[in-house]
């Protein structure tokens, strides 16, 4: 890690500590899950959630009647310096260890895009990162206090934090793209009863970017399967293409953020 990246993370941690004072000291490193993709981890954690969720981890705001974010009202605003500031606070329930993971996730956006997550002062619209009962977020800016949930027992990983924050910037799951049927096959008979609605296509702005099998926002092959190991999503024409990952934002994920916000 170079000096600038290290400094960035230290500054982020300082901001997090100002948002809510640290109450305990723990080791700074947390490992990502080694055997499952991010979506599988999220869905497993969210099984016990009392929140009404769409596509596994998306909250439908009360001021919208569908998962639609078509106009600029649900995007975060760019300032005079062409920087998109997203005010946020972090719950005091998170440990210093948790906050370092969140800071790491935020630093990826700062290093690769014009998005800047800034500690909230008096801004009316802001993200509140909280230890709720699951991993979830709304799509885009909803107005006022906007909860991004990262449950301490299953969601505090850099990749999951990036995934949920990317939802908050306005991005859907990759397999929800309007043109997805050209790239994946949905195996409807393998989907758990009552879960098919999670595979509906959305009216998306694909920004003239290619379908990204490697997107951080893509379901894994067995999402919502009726039994373990059954594929609910199969890449086409090459069924062996890997989908679902845990590392973090892909190059195309980053490209789309920059295109959407005119970075």
UniProtKB/Swiss-Prot annotation:
The active site is at 164. This is Hatching enzyme 1.2. It comes from the Eukaryota. GO terms for molecular function: metalloendopeptidase activity; metallopeptidase activity; zinc ion binding. It catalyses: Hydrolysis of the inner layer of fish egg envelope. Also hydrolysis of casein and small molecule substrates such as succinyl-Leu-Leu-Val-Tyr-|-7-(4-methyl)coumarylamide. It comes from Danio rerio. Its EC number is 3.4.24.67. Disulfide bonds join 69-74, 114-263, 135-155. It holds the Pfam family Astacin. Gene3D superfamilies: Collagenase (Catalytic Domain) (3.40.390.10). Metalloendopeptidase which participates in the breakdown of the egg envelope at the time of hatching. Cleaves the N-terminal regions of the zona pellucia glycoproteins ZP2 and ZP3, where it specifically recognizes the peptide sequences TVQQS-|-DYLIK (major site) and KLMLK-|-APEPF (minor site). The lineage of its organism: Eukaryota, Metazoa, Chordata, Craniata, Vertebrata. It is found in: Secreted. Its main location: secreted. Residues 1-19 form the signal peptide. Residues 20-64 form a propeptide. Residues 65-263 form the Peptidase M12A domain.
């Amino acid at each position: 890690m170079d000096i600038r990246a290290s400094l960035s993370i230290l500054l982020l941690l300082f901001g997090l500590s100002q948002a809510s004072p640290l109450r305990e000291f723990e080791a700074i490193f947390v490992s990502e899950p080694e055997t499952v993709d991010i979506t599988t981890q999220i869905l497993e954690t969210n099984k016990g959630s009392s929140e009404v969720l769409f596509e596994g981890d998306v909250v439908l705001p009360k001021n919208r009647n569908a998962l639609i974010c078509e106009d600029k009202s649900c995007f975060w605003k760019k300032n005079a310096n062409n920087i998109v500031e997203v005010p946020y606070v972090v719950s005091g329930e998170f440990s210093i260890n948790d906050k370092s993971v969140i800071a790491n996730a935020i630093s990826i956006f700062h290093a690769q895009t014009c998005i800047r997550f800034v500690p909230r002062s008096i801004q009316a619209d802001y993200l509140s990162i909280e230890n709720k009962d699951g991993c979830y977020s709304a799509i885009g800016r909803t107005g006022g206090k906007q909860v991004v949930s990262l449950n301490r027992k299953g969601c505090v990983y850099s990749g999951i934090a990036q995934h949920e924050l990317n939802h908050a910037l306005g991005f859907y799951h990759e397999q929800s793209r309007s043109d997805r049927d050209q790239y994946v096959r949905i195996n409807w008979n393998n989907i758990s009863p009552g879960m098919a609605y999670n595979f509906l296509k959305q009216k998306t702005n694909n920004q003239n970017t290619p379908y990204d099998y490697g997107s951080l926002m893509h379901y894994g092959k067995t999402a919502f399967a009726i039994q373990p190991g059954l594929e609910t999503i199969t890449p086409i024409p090459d069924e062996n293409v890997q989908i679902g990952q845990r590392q973090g934002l892909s190059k195309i994920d980053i490209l789309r953020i920059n295109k959407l916000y005119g970075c």
